[in-house]
């Protein structure tokens, strides 16, 4: 996954912790149907990516995409659809595969509910401070 570190369960459990000031946290609830198993796992589809290396690949098209990714997204994750301003989808996928194989781009899988049911997800990032909390993902 993109995020790592502390996990906040829905209920208190052994190992629960207190939020510390000036640390950033991502609150990322998942909602499933009532028929779900109650957990998610990585699926096969990958539509979120992040730059892993700026090292040139010696492939002109791949290097052009690397430059575009760096200029537009830097080290932040990006969606395939954001590349479609410059490339057709089939071409973007082909070039991304080259970058993934050369370990220049990392692909993140879509999360799937344990028994294949639908999953909805939202996210806010927040930073506790002495006055409460700052939510950095507010519009």
Task: Please annotate each region the language model reported.
Residues 1-139:
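Active-site neighborhoods and metal-handling regions in enzymes and metal-associated proteins
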């Amino acid at each position: 996954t993109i995020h790592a570190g502390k996990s906040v369960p829905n209920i208190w459990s052994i190992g629960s912790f207190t939020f510390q000031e000036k640390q950033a946290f991502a609150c990322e609830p998942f909602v499933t149907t009532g028929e779900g198993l109650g957990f998610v796992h990585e699926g096969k589809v990958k539509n979120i990516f992040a730059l892993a290396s700026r090292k040139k690949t010696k492939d002109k098209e791949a290097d052009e995409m690397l430059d575009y990714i760096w200029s537009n997204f830097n080290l932040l994750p990006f969606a395939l659809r954001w590349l479609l301003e410059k490339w057709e989808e089939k071409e973007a996928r082909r070039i991304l595969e080259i970058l993934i194989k050369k370990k220049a781009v990392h692909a993140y899988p879509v999360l799937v509910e344990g028994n294949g049911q639908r999953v909805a997800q939202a996210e806010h990032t927040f930073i506790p401070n002495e006055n409460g909390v700052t939510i950095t993902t507010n519009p």
